[in-house]
Design a protein with these regions (language model features):
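ATP-dependent small-molecule kinase phosphotransfer cores
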Residues: 23-87, 172-178, 182-184
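Walker A (P-loop) ATP-phosphate-binding motif of ABC ATPase nucleotide-binding domains
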Residues: 2
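Conserved lysine of the Walker
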Residues: 13
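A glycine- and Lys/Arg-enriched "phosphate-lid" helix/loop adjacent to the NTP-binding pocket
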Residues: 37-39, 97-140
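NTP-dependent small-molecule kinase module
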Residues: 133-185
Length: 185
């Protein structure tokens, strides 16, 4: 069974995925490994080969989509990790992060100011959450702000096992983002 671990870059997906007791497939590694259509000239990043990714995930996973998470053992789950992973599953857990903290993380990664702003706007506008809700039958949302990776991993396992439900719509950064000027230098 597959479940997406998705969210704006910098929200903690890779760090938390490394702590989960399930099989992890890193979508970004697959894109960097050749499942791409080349570099997008405007954005300077690799453009994912979505059809190629779907085929490769099916080959690597061989299990199918997650139809029912009630009391599922986390070890029976394949987590597809990455900010476009929700395109390949019926269920997604979307990580959210306060844009003020997100800005610090993205700058520490050496992202250009344009890329930082693009990702802050995406987070403030719920871009990944909205996509996940459109593409997935089930979506849970975790605000990772102020939580340790272990605490977030515990929440993810709880969601996977059906012990907790974290429905979307609980997190909104838009008003704070607009009022505070986080996107400005």
């Amino acid at each position: 069974m597959r479940i997406a671990l998705t969210g704006t870059p910098g929200t903690g997906k890779s760090t938390v995925a490394a702590l989960l007791p399930c099989r992890i497939l890193d979508i970004n590694a697959l894109v960097k490994g050749g499942l791409n259509l080349g570099t997008d000239p405007e954005r300077g990043c690799l453009e994912a080969d979505m059809e190629g990714l779907e085929r490769r995930l099916d080959e690597l996973d061989g299990i199918g989509d997650l139809d029912n998470t009630d009391r599922v053992d986390a070890s029976d789950i394949t987590v597809i990790e990455g900010h476009i992973s929700h395109y390949f599953t019926d269920s997604a857990i979307v990580f959210r992060l306060n844009p003020k903290e997100l800005k610090k993380r993205l700058q520490a990664r050496g992202y250009s100011e344009k890329k930082v702003r693009e990702n802050l706007e995406a987070e403030a506008l719920d871009a990944i959450l909205i996509e996940a809700v459109e593409f997935c039958d089930r979506v849970d949302e975790i605000d990772t702000t102020g939580l340790s990776p272990a605490e977030v991993a515990d929440l993810v396992v709880g969601v996977i096992q059906g012990k907790i439900r974290l429905p979307p719509g609980q997190v909104s950064w838009l008003e704070d983002f607009v009022d505070s000027g986080w996107a400005e230098g």
